[in-house]
Every structure is written in structure tokens, then in C-alpha cells.
Amino acid sequence: MGKIWVLHGPNLNLLGRREPDKYGTQTLDEINNELLHKAHTAGIPIQVEQTNFEGELIQWIHSMGPDDFLIINPGAWTHYSYAVRDAITSVQVPTIEVHLSNIHAREEFRKTSVIAPVCCGQISGLGGKSYSLALDYALEALTQK
């Protein structure tokens, strides 16, 4: 059975104090703890990481196995990182892109995702619930294999 990876991109370490009107007051630790608890309860291995360095994120993606599942919030890399997109394509694992805020209702430059076309889905605008819903899907997908 594969592992679920949850990768958080740049500035997400500041959740809870960074623009709470857009991202809410829930901290990254609170989100991660909910995800860890849910996955452990289901008996599915999970690894959760956050980085502000694009190369580090890409290395984690490269280390994924063929039976793994990726939940990723690429942060600002969503809009321009073809390197992250290519990394996801190269490992060919099912991927869901998540965002706390509704990127389609924000500034024009945020409405474009270069990551979404290589994902099986995108969930945005539901705060921390975006991650929880993505995890529900990943758990179902892994237990049906």
C-alpha cells in the first residue's frame, strides 16, 4: 500500500498569522495534526512536509513511489513553477492541488494554475477543509487499490 504525501509550499508556515482574512486563523500545525490523526486512524502511512525552497519540494516529489498519493498546496509556485509541474508529471502519482483561499476569486495572476492540469483534481476556497476533503479522496483511492 502506498503512502500519502502532504506537501505545503512557501509561506504556509505562517498560517494563523499571515493574512487571516484570506487564509483563516488555523495554523499549519493544526491542519497537519488533523490530517495525521485521520490517516493514522485509517491505518494509512502519511508524510507531511513544508518548505520555502522549491528544490526541496521537488526532491520530496522525486522520492515518491508508484503507489503513493500527493496532496499539494504549492502556494505561489502554483502560478509559475513548471519545475514543480514537471516533477509531478515525472513521478506519475495521483495528485490533488489544494488551496485555503479561492484562487479563482482573487487577483488576476492567482487565477492561473500551471499545476492543476497535471492533477486529478483541485480543491480551493474551503480553508483547512480543503486539505481534509483531499485526504478523504486519497484515503479512498489508496484503500481501493
Curated annotation (Swiss-Prot):
Cited Pfam families: DHquinase_II
Site (Transition state stabilizer): R18
Active-site residues, as the UniProt record annotates them: Y23 (proton acceptor), H99 (proton donor)
Catalytic activity, EC: 4.2.1.10
A single GO BP: quinate catabolic process
Coiled coil residues, start to end: none
Gene3D superfamilies: Dehydroquinase, class II
Catalyzed reactions per annotation: 3-dehydroquinate = 3-dehydroshikimate + H2O
Binding site for substrate: N73, H79, D86, L100, S101, R110
Protein origin, superkingdom: Bacteria
UniProt GO MF annotations: 3-dehydroquinate dehydratase activity
Cross-referenced PANTHER family: CATABOLIC 3-DEHYDROQUINASE
Assembly notes: Homododecamer.
Similarity comment: Belongs to the type-II 3-dehydroquinase family.
Protein name: 3-dehydroquinate dehydratase
Organism annotation: Desulfitobacterium hafniense (strain Y51)
Gene: aroQ
